[in-house]
């Protein structure tokens, strides 16, 4: 969609936003919502008349490392969030991805964008997603009404369900201002164990066996030989299963020794090399130079081999897997055919979700970038949208047509 003209409306707080939303309702207009616009490529192109800019919603409000809570405004840049947490040797456990290389954006964006898209990295497999760490928030709905959910205490579960609903809604239900997140201490150390495998099925099975052991891995990925080479790793097998262990030094060393003894061909990466490798996996840097579109596909790990085999029969593609095989990152040809084939393969292998992340051509004009909804789920989404935003003011159509 090419916009000829629109007004950029800068707001500094929720009272300003309420006035803008009230005016939009009166004029029967739609508003786009953005801060740094680093995730503007995700989802559909919203149908808006004017754009409300919330980048002024920025700054750390309260950080209590001893209580494991961080309160800040949603427009706070991620580099500021990360430096604040690093000052107390803490982190966001869901491991925020920085997709600026594949999205051709200037930075990792804001914490609000992270929450709006529920962006979660490799540790999601064991630690949960972004929505699981949002303790509370202050926001304004598409009705122009301010509301609060949750609180600032880790034990306080009030509002968690609403946090889970608003996270991942792409700004279609409400605009965040103040948010409170649960933080965690950084692990003392981390290492990675590399296990060569003959094929994808063997890699998935190997990882499943390790996760069934008492050795507490917290992340697992699978790299084909050519992708591993991009990360500077020479692989003897067709696939490389990667296991990450984190914790205190003595525990990590003991667990690694047991796993290496049980899997004779395993190789250990030290902490620095392990950290660098998982950053490349988290940020999808390993596909940044690939031609065509990039898709993110969520499925059952056991379904991954059949899905990849089906796609390789028809397309020239590159891929790797995160979340023990449950998250496939794929680079393939632009256009509708690749995405359609992916969704057909998903449907034939237990279902899942395929999302277009990088559109290198005009694929968004030809195929829905987010997984299409069943009629029942579409009706449910419509009802939720009507409850928060009955006039469809906020980011109308950003996720699904007509919502």
Outline where the language-model segments fall.
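N-terminal accessory segments
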Residues: 1-40, 268, 349-372
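Short glycine-biased active-site loop of nucleotidyltransferases that positions the nucleotide triphosphate
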Residues: 40-46, 232-234
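Structural motif
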Residues: 6-9, 29-32, 49-52, 68-70, ...
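Residue-level signal for inorganic ion chemistry
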Residues: 35, 75, 243, 330
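Short, conserved charged micro-motifs
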Residues: 79-81, 200-205, 249-257, 303-310, ...
